[in-house]
C-alpha cells in the first residue's frame, strides 16, 4: 500500500467485515430441524445478513407458501393487543433486523406491518423472503398489509424488479407480484385503531366498504383501493384553511389529502379512537397529529420504520408498541449495510465511461503539441466572397483528401470524448434520489463517497424536498423508456455539438492535418526529384 504496508492477496483486507456467502444452501440447511415442513428462520436471518441467496426453488417455495396464507385472510384484519405496529421498511434488511431487536423476537412478539417492504433500498427481496418466512411460522401473530409499493407499476419503475432479476430471475419477481396482490388492505387493532398504509378516501364511510374491495389485482390509479394505499393527511392538518374534507393530492399525483374534520368524522362514525398509518418519512420516525375533541387522543399517527431512509435522510425509525392500553414509541437508528452501486451495476461497468473519458482526453492532449506561433502561421487562407463554386470530386490520393481525413478523425476523437463525458455523467446519476435541478447530484458527488453525499444533502428536510418527485405516482413503463431515450439522444447530440464548436479541438485537427499534408507534399517532391536525377 502507499504507506508501505504489505497486504496479502489471499486474505481479506478488513477482517472484521464478514465475507459474503457465495454458495446457495442445501435443503438440509434450508429446512428447519424443529419442523422440516418450514424454513429455518435462524439460518435465513444469518444467510441474508451475509448477502447470501437461496436457490430459485427455495425462494419460490417461501413466496408461494406465504401467498397461500395471505390469500386466505380477509381484506380487513382484526387483532387484539398487545401488538407492535411497524411502518415502511423499503428494502432495508439490516435495519429490519434492528427493528426486531428493538421490537422483540417475532416468536414472542405480535407484529403488524403496514406495507412498503420493497423498492428504494437494495435488499428488498431479502426483506420479502424473511417476512414471508415469518408469516409461514407465525400466521396468527404476524400480519402483513399492502403498501403502495407492493404493485407491478412501482416495482418496475423503482428498484425491486431490477433487484429480482439481478439476484434471482424474473420468475421470482412475477411470484412476488402475485403474492403482493394477496396482501390484506387494512386492520382494526383492539377494536380501537384503524391501521392502513395510506389514508382515508371520499368513498370510505364505514369499515364495511373495505371488506367489499376486490384486492386481488393491480391497484387502480383512483378509487377506494388507491386512496387506502396513497392518501396523506393535509400538511396543515388541524389548521385547515378550507372546509373541504378531501383535496387532490398534488404531491403524489393521485388520490387525496384528507383533513382533520374528515378524520374526526370517520372515527366518530365508526366508533374508533385513531388512524395508524405509514407512507411518509418522518424525521423522528413517527408523528402524532391533532387530538380529537371527543377523546383527546391523536386523530392520526404516522409510523415510519426505515432509518436514514435512502442513506441520506438522516431520520430515526420507530415502532409503536401497544399493550395494556398503553402506547409506547420505540425509536432506533440505522445499521451499517453493504454498499451497492446504482441500479446494481458492477464496478467495471460503472467505471468504463470514466476510463474512456480520461483516455480520449489524454489522446487529445498528446495531439495538442503545437505552439502559439505555429497556430498563427497556420491560419486558414481567406476565401473570396464571390459565389461559392460547387464542390469538385476529390482524388483519394490527393494531399487535400488525406488532410481532411486526418482532420475528421481528430474531430471524431473529440466527439468520442464528449460522448464518454455524457456516459460518465449518466454513471454518476443517483436514480433513486434526483435533485430538483436537472435530476442529478452535483457532478463528482459519488466519487466523494458517503461524505460527498452528506455535504450535498445536509438534513432531513433537504432530502425530503429533493426526493418529492419520487413520491409521485410514476409514469407508465412505455413513457419512462421514451423519456429515457429522448434524454440520452439529446445528451449525445449536445456532446457532438460541443465537440464541433470546440475551437481548440478544431485548431489541433487543422494543425495536424496540415502538418501531415505538408509532409506528404515534401515526400512527393523528393521522390520526383530523385526520379529526374535518375
UniProtKB/Swiss-Prot annotation:
Q: Which reaction does it catalyse?
A: O-phospho-L-seryl-[protein] + H2O = L-seryl-[protein] + phosphate; O-phospho-L-threonyl-[protein] + H2O = L-threonyl-[protein] + phosphate
- Cellular component GO terms, alphabetical: calcineurin complex; cytoplasm
Cite the entry's keywords alphabetically: Calmodulin-binding, Hydrolase, Iron, Metal-binding, Protein phosphatase, Zinc
Q: What is its EC number?
A: 3.1.3.16
One record GO biological process: calcineurin-mediated signaling
Q: What class of enzyme is it?
A: hydrolase
Write out the catalytic residues in the record.
149 (proton donor)
Cofactors that this protein relies on: Fe(3+); Zn(2+)
| Residues bound to Zn(2+) | 116, 148, 197, 279
Can you quote the record's cofactor note? Binds 1 Fe(3+) ion per subunit.
Q: List, alphabetically, the InterPro entries matched.
A: Calcineurin-like_PHP_ApaH, Metallo-depent_PP-like, MPP_PP2B, PP2B, Ser/Thr-sp_prot-phosphatase
Q: Where is this region: Disordered?
A: 375-398, 475-534
Q: Which Pfam families match?
A: Metallophos
Molecular function via GO: calmodulin binding; calmodulin-dependent protein phosphatase activity; metal ion binding
Binding sites annotated in the UniProt record for Fe cation:
88, 90, 116
Q: How does it assemble?
A: Composed of two components (A and B), the A component is the catalytic subunit and the B component confers calcium sensitivity.
**PANTHER family annotated for this entry?**
SERINE/THREONINE-PROTEIN PHOSPHATASE 2B CATALYTIC SUBUNIT 1-RELATED
Question: What family name appears in the similarity comment?
Answer: Belongs to the PPP phosphatase family. PP-2B subfamily.
The free-text function statement in the UniProt record for this protein reads: Calcium-dependent, calmodulin-stimulated protein phosphatase. This subunit may have a role in the calmodulin activation of calcineurin.
Report what the protein is called: Serine/threonine-protein phosphatase 2B catalytic subunit
Native source species: Aspergillus fumigatus (strain ATCC MYA-4609 / CBS 101355 / FGSC A1100 / Af293) (Neosartorya fumigata)
Q: What is the lineage of its organism?
A: Eukaryota, Fungi, Dikarya, Ascomycota, Pezizomycotina
Quote the gene name from the UniProt entry.
cnaA
Amino acid at each position: 500500500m502507499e504507506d508501505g504496508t504489505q497486504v496479502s492477496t489471499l486474505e481479506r483486507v478488513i477482517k472484521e467485515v464478514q465475507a459474503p456467502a457465495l454458495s446457495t444452501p442445501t435443503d438440509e440447511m434450508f429446512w428447519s430441524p424443529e419442523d422440516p415442513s418450514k424454513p429455518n428462520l435462524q439460518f435465513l436471518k444469518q444467510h441474508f445478513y451475509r448477502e447470501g441467496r437461496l436457490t430459485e426453488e427455495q425462494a419460490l417455495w417461501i413466496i408461494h407458501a406465504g401467498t397461500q396464507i395471505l390469500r386466505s385472510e380477509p381484506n380487513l384484519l382484526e387483532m387484539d393487543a398487545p401488538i407492535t405496529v411497524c411502518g415502511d421498511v423499503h428494502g432495508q434488511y439490516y435495519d429490519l433486523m434492528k427493528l426486531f431487536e428493538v421490537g422483540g423476537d417475532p416468536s414472542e412478539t405480535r407484529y403488524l406491518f403496514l406495507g412498503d417492504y420493497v423498492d428504494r433500498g437494495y435488499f428488498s427481496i431479502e426483506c420479502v423472503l424473511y417476512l414471508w418466512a415469518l408469516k409461514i411460522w407465525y400466521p396468527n401473530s404476524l400480519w402483513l398489509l399492502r403498501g403502495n409499493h407492493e404493485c407491478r407499476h412501482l416495482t418496475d419503475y423503482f428498484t425491486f424488479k431490477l433487484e429480482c432479476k439481478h439476484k434471482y430471475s424474473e420468475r421470482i419477481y412475477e411470484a412476488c407480484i402475485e403474492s403482493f396482490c394477496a396482501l390484506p388492505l387494512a386492520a382494526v387493532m383492539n377494536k380501537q385503531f384503524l391501521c392502513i398504509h395510506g389514508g382515508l378516501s371520499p368513498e370510505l364511510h364505514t369499515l364495511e366498504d373495505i371488506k367489499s374491495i376486490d384486492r386481488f389485482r393491480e391497484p387502480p390509479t383512483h378509487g377506494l383501493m388507491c386512496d387506502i394505499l396513497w392518501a396523506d393527511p393535509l400538511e396543515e392538518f388541524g389548521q385547515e384553511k378550507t372546509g373541504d374534507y378531501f383535496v387532490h393530492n398534488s404531491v403524489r399525483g393521485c388520490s387525496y389529502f384528507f383533513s382533520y374534520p374528515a378524520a374526526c368524522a370517520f372515527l366518530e362514525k365508526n366508533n374508533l379512537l385513531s388512524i395508524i398509518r405509514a407512507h411518509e418519512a418522518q424525521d423522528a420516525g413517527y408523528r402524532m397529529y391533532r387530538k380529537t375533541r371527543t377523546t383527546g387522543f391523536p386523530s392520526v399517527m404516522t409510523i415510519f420504520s426505515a432509518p436514514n431512509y435512502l442513506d441520506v435522510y438522516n431520520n430515526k425509525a420507530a415502532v409503536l408498541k401497544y399493550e395494556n392500553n398503553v402506547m409506547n414509541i420505540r425509536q432506533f437508528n440505522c445499521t451499517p449495510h453493504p454498499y451497492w452501486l446504482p441500479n446494481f451495476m458492477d464496478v467495471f461497468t460503472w467505471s468504463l465511461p470514466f476510463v474512456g473519458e480520461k483516455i480520449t482526453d489524454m489522446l487529445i492532449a498528446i495531439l495538442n503539441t503545437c505552439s502559439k506561433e505555429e497556430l498563427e502561421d497556420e491560419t486558414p487562407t481567406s476565401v473570396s466572397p464571390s459565389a461559392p463554386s460547387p464542390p469538385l470530386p476529390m482524388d483519394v490520393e490527393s494531399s487535400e483528401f488525406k488532410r481532411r481525413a486526418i482532420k475528421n478523425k481528430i474531430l471524431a476523437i473529440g466527439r468520442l470524448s464528449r460522448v464518454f463525458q455524457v456516459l460518465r455523467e449518466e454513471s454518476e446519476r443517483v436514480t433513486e434520489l434526483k435533485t430538483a435541478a436537472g435530476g442529478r447530484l452535483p457532478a463528482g458527488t459519488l466519487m466523494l463517497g458517503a461524505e460527498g453525499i452528506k455535504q450535498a444533502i445536509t438534513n432531513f428536510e433537504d432530502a425530503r424536498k429533493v426526493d418529492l418527485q419520487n413520491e409521485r405516482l410514476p409514469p407508465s413503463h412505455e413513457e419512462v423508456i421514451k423519456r429515457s431515450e429522448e434524454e440520452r439522444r439529446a445528451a449525445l447530440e449536445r456532446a457532438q455539438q460541443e465537440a464541433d464548436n470546440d475551437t481548440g479541438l478544431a485548431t489541433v485537427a487543422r494543425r495536424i492535418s496540415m502538418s501531415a499534408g505538408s509532409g506528404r507534399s515534401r515526400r512527393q517532391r523528393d521522390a520526383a526529384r530523385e526520379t529526374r536525377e535518375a
